């Protein structure tokens, strides 16, 4: 039996004046799946998340959320919760009071059951110790966690989150990752955007990459990372000049200029661009020549390299 869809979008188009924010976008998210949405600034991620939350309506295409077609009206679909940009909070209220106000707006239980639910989501977000602190003093990471707590109030079947790890320290990030993983295991569909590839690698089974409003990749994360493409590698050896000579003479190896994302100035490091077989041959030659290899590491992860290649191709047309 097929797993039901949390989101099924076909040919979604959205305009802002003459600007095409989304251009025939397809998206499939099943229940129990954490689906990553990634792209450069202005790619259309926030617009798409807003459509899922009922904050905007599409100008074209078909959108089904939790099996129900979405009408062309501004309304949050039943069973959906989350936030885009940043959670809206009342700074003069405590975390608990913010959640109580939101619960009242949503018509949730105001009695003991409602208070217990607020306690539960505060604990789930790791905010019990600051539940009675005013949110004006909250850090960005604490505000993000309170936004997550607010989204969980209604026990949504689809959770839509914009940069949920933004501002979190490593411990806070691990906590949020555990919460999202548990929710997915319990059958909740999760769509999240992130600029951090480590978030996607830690959480997502599938990912959709947007560039200039179009889908340039959608599918399993491991398929994206496994695609055979040249990567930049940082190579440090006991004899940099010998390593450079061997690299220049090895087929399939290009010596990079040592500038760009993830590259640090290191006079002893050689940055080479290659497919894995050519890199293996270079390392073998270096070792045979008696030179010690001290470090060999990709400058960026295979996933980030794939993201950069796909989005740059779409934006430049090359």
Language model: regions and residue ranges:
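ABC transporter nucleotide-binding domain
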Residues: 177-273
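ABC transporter nucleotide-binding domains
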Residues: 4-7, 14-211
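C-terminal coupling/interaction segments
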Residues: 3, 274-318
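Alpha-helix N-cap/helix-start and coil->helix boundary motif
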Residues: 13, 70, 77, 96, ...
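Small/polar loops that bind or transfer phosphate-bearing groups
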Residues: 81, 85, 192, 235, ...
């Amino acid at each position: 039996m097929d797993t039901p869809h949390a989101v099924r979008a076909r040919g979604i188009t959205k305009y802002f004046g003459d600007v095409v924010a989304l251009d025939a976008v397809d998206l499939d998210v099943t229940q129990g799946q954490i689906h990553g949405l990634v792209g450069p600034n202005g790619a259309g991620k926030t617009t798409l998340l807003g459509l899922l939350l009922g904050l905007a309506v599409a100008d074209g295409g078909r959108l089904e959320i939790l099996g129900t077609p979405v009408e062309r009206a501004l309304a949050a679909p039943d069973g959906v919760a989350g936030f885009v940009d940043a959670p809206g909070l009342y700074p003069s209220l405590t975390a608990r009071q913010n959640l109580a106000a939101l619960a009242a707006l949503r018509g949730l239980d105001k009695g003991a059951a409602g208070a217990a639910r607020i306690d539960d989501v505060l604990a789930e977000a790791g905010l019990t110790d600051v539940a009675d602190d005013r949110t004006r003093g909250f850090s960005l990471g604490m505000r993000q966690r309170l936004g997550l707590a607010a989204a969980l109030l209604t026990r949504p079947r689809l959770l839509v989150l914009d940069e949920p790890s933004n501002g979190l320290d490593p411990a806070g990030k691990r906590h949020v990752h555990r919460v999202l993983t548990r929710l997915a295991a319990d059958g909740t569909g999760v769509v999240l955007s992130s600029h951090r590839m480590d978030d996607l690698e830690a959480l997502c089974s599938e990912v959709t990459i947007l560039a200039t409003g179009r889908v340039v990749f959608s599918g399993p994360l491991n398929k994206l990372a496994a695609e055979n493409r040249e990567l930049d590698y940082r190579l440090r050896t006991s004899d940099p000049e010998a390593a450079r000579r061997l690299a220049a003479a090895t087929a399939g190896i290009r010596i990079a200029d040592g500038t760009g994302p993830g590259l640090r100035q290191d006079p002893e490091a050689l940055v080479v661009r290659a497919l894995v077989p050519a890199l293996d041959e270079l390392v073998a030659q270096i070792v045979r020549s008696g030179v010690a290899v001290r470090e060999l590491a990709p400058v960026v992860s295979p996933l980030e390299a794939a993201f950069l290649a796909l989005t740059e191709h779409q934006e430049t047309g090359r």
